[in-house]
């Protein structure tokens, strides 16, 4: 809040990406305003998928029951780190099936947070960070258009071009 009322220009856009971990191609993208929670575009992005999704890697902000429900309905295994103060919902003596979030909490308790991330392969999520870095390096961090619908088109075109660059060839590391 500013001294003289609300800021008029302090807004930003969030680009949500879904990456195929094998090919490193962007398979879905969604541009939202800054007041949309990160879990909101996930169902729509999953609906865009033509190939089945086996695992979903996400950062800690996606640790919500809505997301777990969405992934469970589609039969997708979530790999999302629980919040540090997370508690078990179903304990070991329950006859109900185990919840993926509870398993993540148990894993963090047993192996430590870093150990759990290594065990479940959570660091594959960094492929998305790499794609975002490549996108910003090639096209810059700003959008040219002013209207949201035009910015959505612009971001979609940028992702298509980046996919084309990816198909041409990625650097090989040894």
Show the residue positions of the predicted features:
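Short secondary-structure boundary micro-motifs
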Residues: 1-3, 39, 44, 102, ...
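Intrinsically disordered and other compositionally biased segments
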Residues: 10, 97-102, 156, 167, ...
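Polybasic low-complexity intrinsically disordered regions
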Residues: 1-83, 88, 136, 154-159
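Short, Lys/Arg-enriched charge-dense amphipathic segments
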Residues: 7-9, 78-84, 107, 165-174
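Helix-centered, glycine/charged polyanion-binding patches within enzymatic domains
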Residues: 65-136
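Basic, amphipathic alpha-helical segments enriched in Lys/Arg and hydrophobic/aromatic residues
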Residues: 114-174
């Amino acid at each position: 809040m500013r001294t003289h009322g609300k800021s008029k220009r302090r807004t930003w856009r969030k680009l949500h990406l879904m990456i195929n971990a094998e090919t490193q191609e962007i398979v879905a993208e969604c541009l939202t305003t800054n007041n949309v929670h990160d879990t909101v575009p996930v169902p729509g992005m999953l609906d865009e998928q033509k190939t089945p999704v086996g695992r979903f890697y996400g950062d800690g902000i996606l640790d919500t029951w809505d997301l777990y429900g969405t992934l469970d309905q589609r039969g997708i295994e979530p790999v999302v780190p629980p919040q540090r103060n997370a508690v078990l919902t179903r304990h070991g003596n329950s006859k109900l099936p185990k919840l993926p979030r509870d398993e993540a909490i148990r894993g963090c308790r047993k192996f430590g947070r870093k150990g759990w991330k290594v065990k479940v392969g959570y660091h594959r999520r960094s492929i998305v960070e790499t794609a975002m870095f490549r996108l910003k390096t090639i096209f810059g961090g700003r959008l040219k258009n002013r209207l949201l619908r035009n910015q959505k088109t612009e971001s979609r075109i940028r992702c298509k071009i980046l996919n084309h660059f990816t198909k041409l060839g990625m650097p090989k590391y040894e």
